[in-house]
Amino acid sequence: MSNVMVVPGMLSAAAADVASIGAALSAANGAAAPTTAGVLAAGADEVSAAIASLFSGYARDYQALSAQMARFHQQFVQALTASVGSYAAAEAANASPLQALEQQVLAAINAPTQTLLGRPLIGNGADGLPGQNGGAGGLLWGNGGNGGAGDAAHPNGGNGGDAGMFGNGGAGGAGYSPAAGTGAAGGAGGAGGAGGWLSGNGGAGGNGGTGASGADGGGGLPPVPASPGGNGGGGDAGGAAGMFGTGGAGGTGGDGGAGGAGDSPNSGANGARGGDGGNGAAGGAGGRLFGNGGAGGNGGTAGQGGDGGTALGAGGIGGDGGTGGAGGTGGTAGIGGSSAGAGGAGGDGGAGGTGGGSSMIGGKGGTGGNGGVGGTGGASALTIGNGSSAGAGGAGGAGGTGGTGGYIESLDGKGQAGNGGNGGNGAAGGAGGGGTGAGGNGGAGGNGGDGGPSQGGGNPGFGGDGGTGGPGGVGVPDGIGGANGAQGKHG
């Protein structure tokens, strides 16, 4: 018995095409009718009249036949259009029983393991509520649920659920970013879930939340000091893969909040320090037999220092910039000739705050924050065959710019500028994997971060050191060692 597959949408489009063809033919017949049905005789003789009458008769017969075909065409289009509705109604009627049957069969299959182990045999894990972990996937087949993003009541993101035998791990939830002006720290991201133990990718780690900016200072006796910016939340690690699969990427660290500004114009109070950037997290390990390691997460950018307040007396000192977050370590590779994950880049240091202006003495600018250290590249494992390449080390973060000194109106000069921050050091590259064939290449070292410049009068920051390249793996021949990272530029 042959089977017929019908897609109502395609059938409806075909009916519209057939209707447009009929309309075009009717228009052509109508345009030709006046000139073909009333052919004039070429002369006054009987032969010419007979020929004209013969052709005119043919035209009238054609028009009559065309009218019959037009009626048939209209009936065909109506039948085709009606069949679209019939098929659509049949699909709608059959869909609900089939879905119900599917749910009943799955419920019967999952009932024993759900009762004994609290986990289904087949099916995806549920996504977590805010700040809660995602559910585990089915023991045999199913992806882990994603962790819920953090909120005010549960600032840290939930972890992603683990998969069973086959399936991908759930992604970790992002950390909560509190409201500006509170100076609260950002929530940490959740860890990625593990991939299926036989086959499946690890879930990505959740990103850290952004730290809130600090509150500005206020007047009074004594004046209310400005509050520092909140630190960015740390990212969490990516999930490990199973036997086959790629490790999850590590979460990115959250940015630090800006420091609050000092009070103006009463006290000329100092600005507050910017928050530190959150650390990036490690990438997940690649599959134990074959799979790439996940990349490490980047460190968060630090917050800028608050500006110093202005006053009739001495202006306030600008706040120091925060330190950039460190990059995460790259995930290790599997033994089947895969690549290890690259280390995450260090976060940039925050800029120093501007010194407060004054009619007498300008305030000093804040010191720029130091850049974060790059993450180490992932290592490769011993392989059968050619060795695998290691991950590159992460670059160090750039140092923050030193704050500008405050302006002295009456003495026509400026306050001392802040020093630039130092660049972060680049990380070492991972070691290449050995093998029975050629050894894998070592990972390149990360470049050092550039030192922060000053804004006139202050000392510039020093560039960070480049990371050391990883050694090549042992093999026939041995792998090539990775190149060392470049020294960062001085500010």
Swiss-Prot record:
The record ties this protein, via Gene3D superfamilies, to: HP0062-like domain
Entry's induction text = Expression is down-regulated in macrophages and infected mice.
| Disordered: annotated segments | 207-238, 255-275, 444-491
* Any single Pfam family the record assigns to this protein: PE
Ranges of compositional bias, category Gly residues: 207-221, 229-238, 444-485
Q: What happens when the gene is disrupted?
A: Deletion mutant is partially attenuated during murine tuberculosis, but not during the chronic steps of infection. On day 28 post infection, shows a slight reduction of the bacterial burden, but on day 70, bacterial counts of the mutant are similar to the wild-type strain.
Q: Which InterPro entries match?
A: PE-PGRS_N, PGRS_rpt
Predominant place of localization: other
Cellular compartment(s):
Cell surface
Per the record, its GO cellular-component terms are: cell surface
Q: Which SUPFAM superfamilies match?
A: PE/PPE dimer-like (SSF140459)
Q: Which residues form the PE domain?
A: 1-93
Give the protein family. Belongs to the mycobacterial PE family. PGRS subfamily.
Q: What else is known?
A: Expression of this gene in M.smegmatis leads to low levels of NO and IL-12, increased level of IL-10 and better survival of recombinant strains in macrophages.
Q: What is this protein called?
A: PE-PGRS family protein PE_PGRS26
Provide the species name. Answer: Mycobacterium tuberculosis (strain ATCC 25618 / H37Rv)
Ranked from the top, the taxonomy reads:
Bacteria, Bacillati, Actinomycetota, Actinomycetes, Mycobacteriales
Which gene is transcribed and translated to give this protein?
PE_PGRS26
